[in-house]
Amino acid sequence: MHKVHIIYSRIFQMTVTYNRAVSTESIHNFVSIMSYWHGSLVKSIWKEYAIWIVLYHLILFIYRVVMPIFGWADYCKKVIENWTPHQDMTIPLEFLLGFFVTTVIDRWRKAFQNIPYIEICAFAVAAAIPGRIRIINKKQNEVRAPGGQDLRDVPAVEVNHPVQRGPEAPAAALPMPGAPERPAVALPMPGAPEGPAAIQQPSVDVKLTARRTIIRYLVLSQILLFREISTKVKKRFVDLKCLVDSKFLTDEELKILSKEVKCDHYDSYFLPINWAFSILQEHKVKSNPEFINAWNVIRDWQVKLSLLRNGDFIPIPLAYPQAVFLAIRFYFLVCLFTRQHLDMDDKKSIDYYFPLMTSLQFIFIVGWMKVAEILLNPMGEDDDDFELNNIIDKNLYIGLAIVDTECGKHPEIVKDTIGKDCLPFYPQNDDDNERNRALVGSTKNINLSGRSDTPAASPSVFYVNINVKVENPTPVIVDGARPPPSPPALPPALPNPNEPPPPPPPAEALRADQPRHSLIHEVGAQADPAEANGAQALSPVLPNPNERADEHGHSPVIDNEAQPSPPPAEANRAPIPNQQPQVNGNAAPASPRQAKVPDDPH
């Protein structure tokens, strides 16, 4: 067992965090980032680069020293010159790496999102099984909870909720709506002594033990799965006996776990989750919302674990990483020959001694490939892999704290001292007081031509008339400029009573001079004379298009002797209700009282 603890001893944190070094933009960020060793680019590629540069200089020695002895230098030079133009075109490194790294990062992100954390489950369990209640044990030696906690020193606490024994429980055990909270209750176990001696014996907090056990089972399910997909967790918990020594399992639970898992080929992480569901069903009514919420969050816990398991079972198809890794390594294998400095006389070039540009290309391309290799399995032992052991410890500690020591506790409720302005506080010497500004829209503080968003303070307001009737058009005010008012309409001339009225014009003349949207009630020859006279009196007379308008744009006044009725002004012309429109050039024979004015289609 001590060997397991030595293996798990954390000398340094595996996941490298560098956010503090790049908290502000500065010229020192590059130096700060490049100063890291664990998880760095240099650490991941220096071995392969050392092998490559040694092979490069070995081939350089053969080409410059050995080949001239046998007279093969010119032949090798021609072969290498023929390879060089086709090297970059036949192996598309950027294309292969781009798609591959994108796919790997997407799987890495999904794996990170599916790592379950215990906080939401602990809050839901604490809400589903609230309060505390103690039951007197029969023997003082049997005072250990399943997790190994010694309960002999735990003092008695108040009981806020009764114990629910199931359908056989008496009706008095269920709280009525509005009933006061019950006092502390100590329920004796069968065969336990009665009287003062029973109060002095140790007791077990049933609800507290249930909450702690559910959290322990959830963390246990996480450990059982991580042992199958992570080598770091496997080294910490070599076998199930290590879980008993670490108090994640009891001896009785280990026997049940060993008996129920008949086949070693399948995982067993679902059994502790099943136990947690059973405990939750025993301590809560199913119809309560808190029970449903706790059920859902535990189900989400299982779903995330199953997604992690499926991602480990079915990785990216093997041919894809093989093609990418082989293409990159073969490319730089060819570079050992094609990037040689072939001109023996040009000794001033830096490539004559060291391949500078090829080395930079090797660092960038191979480093890019190493990123994909590291992220391909984030459950491994690389520097930037997930810290699963730390996640297990955190889930256990935080979960037990929420359902045990911090359950049902809060500070005393007092009135806050925040003012009505609710302004944030900054120290007087803090630069953030001047830097921090409100997050508002990008065009909120732009003032165009002195206008404001408040209508009362706006110097010019737009009025838009969308009425389809055009008899009385509404003027449009733009930028405070109002059009000149129209002159008042001229009153119609009074008819001369001494002169007889002229005969009505024939229907053909009216039909020829009629505009498209005019409303004319045609009086036929078969209509009654009285009705025809009434229709003539009510029908408007169209102005003559040959007549000229006055200086104000209105039609001239027409005497009653020349026309049957004066034309009203265009601005004051109102629709005449009982009037029949023309249909297909013929007036509909209807009474003036029954005629209707159709709506203007425009």
Curated annotation (Swiss-Prot):
GO-annotated cellular components: chloride channel complex; plasma membrane
Protein keywords: Cell membrane, Chloride, Chloride channel, Ion channel, Ion transport, Membrane, Transmembrane, Transmembrane helix, Transport
Biased composition (Pro residues): 482-507
Membrane topology term: Multi-pass membrane protein
InterPro entries found in the cross-reference section: Bestrophin, Bestrophin-like
Coiled-coil features, chain-numbered ranges: none
Record flagged with keyword Amino-acid biosynthesis: no
Basic and acidic residues bias locations: 510-520
Keyword Metal-binding among record annotations: no
Protein's cellular compartments: Cell membrane
Region described as Disordered: 477-602
GO terms of molecular function: chloride channel activity
Assembly and interaction partners: Forms oligomers.
Protein's name in the database: Bestrophin homolog 25
Source organism (scientific name): Caenorhabditis elegans
Encoding gene, per UniProt annotation: best-25
